[in-house]
Amino acid sequence: GWATTATEQGMGAMAREAARWVIGPRSFRRLLPAFGWLGPLAMGRTSHAFVAQVKAILEVDESVAEQLEQVHIPTLVLVGNQDILTPRGDSEEIADRMPNAELVVISGAAHGFMVEHATTFNRVLLEFLGRITKAQRAAVADVDAKAS
């Protein structure tokens, strides 16, 4: 796996191997010339830190999922419909467990959707933040009106 590759061959080799998992097939071909960012990004951390991250992800248990029900703040859950690292079903479960979560599935995107579909990602995020800001302002105005 990636942890073994990182440990035995270094972070550069891991980044090359991971790229095909993080970016969808069509986007991979389109973005291949721009992949210069992935190597330095991966090289910025040690293989030890990466292996610890992989281990932590693999050790997550059901108690973490159960705690999601306690998250009541507005939450945006994003997933690419071609994401094989964190599949759509996982994101659906996360959103279903959180009382104020909104799920958005980005068509044609894999795990690296914020890079491969940056325009869509930014639009969806800004729209969500705009709705949250508007709702918070309305709530504050309502409290102020009741206090008067």
Where are these regions (language model features)?
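Conserved alpha/beta-hydrolase "acid-adjacent" motif
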Residues: 84-90
